[in-house]
Amino acid sequence: MTLKNNNLLLGAFYLITAFFLLSSMGAMLKVAATELNTPMIVFLRNFFALVILLPWLFITKKCSLKTDRFGMHFVRSATGITAMYCFFWTIGKLILADAILLSYSAPIFLPVFAYLLLKDKVNLTSSLAVIIGLIGIIIVLQPSKGIFDPSALVGVLAAIFASLAMISIRKMSNTEPAERVVFYFTLLCSLISAIPAFIYWQPMSITNLLAMIGAGFLAAFGQLFLTKGYSIAPPGEVAPFQYSIVLFGTLWGWLLWDERIDLIKGCGFIIVCIAGIIASKANKKKHRIDEIEEI
């Protein structure tokens, strides 16, 4: 077996593990969302992730945390945390698979914002991916009487803001290593979300506290596995594995809440995943750091 094939298999393993961890995080957040409000969930998820992430960064010392791009880190954090608020609110309203699929459809919107904000050329493949993806999202939303479920639309907003965060990461990709981006994102999100969390703070049970600690742990290690996976294998080659999170989310929803999806929605899921894979492969020559947006 060639070195390239070994790297591809190892990269796929890291990514599948990462998305299993992140889908498990989603399940824990859904447990907490039955009692806790979204501002608290967003803050606790970031705070506990930061507590876990800091020791790892200082022990490994993979890169300096000093940066000259603080403004861009703030923009990336502002767009990323907006996506997070939308996603975590949605996760308490929709079945887990729906919330995850809609929020992780960001690659579909990326070519549009790359064209508008970075003046990147949009090729035919990327254009088709956007159109196919939007069709899939409409099928998943399943409009009733001409009106979309507002909760599902918030999930789409999560994907849109996540794609904007990817754009800001791309603008930093020449100077900022992935570990530094992850550090500033987690730090700034913890600080930004602390204020609304303080305003809306409420008592929580031991179960919810443990769920949030677990979510922070899974988020931190999920991000680290993502970074590792994309560092050893070409993003365009391993792009299909990112949608394993939808399968894991569907499994958790079925096991824990007996959530099921019908045939029509299942077809929409497949269409969105295919569109996301096409969009990712169409941009596979971009820097690997573009791919590591994690809500």
PLM segments and residue spans:
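Transmembrane alpha-helices of multi-pass small-molecule transport proteins
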Residues: 10, 35-82, 161-164, 184-199
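Hydrophobic transmembrane alpha-helices of multi-pass small-molecule transport proteins
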Residues: 125-141, 162, 264-283
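Helix-helix packing/entry segments at the starts of transmembrane helices
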Residues: 100-105, 172, 176-188, 223-254
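C-terminal transmembrane-helix exit sites in multi-pass transporters
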Residues: 87, 106-128, 247-266
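C-terminal-most transmembrane helix of multi-pass membrane proteins
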Residues: 2, 247-295
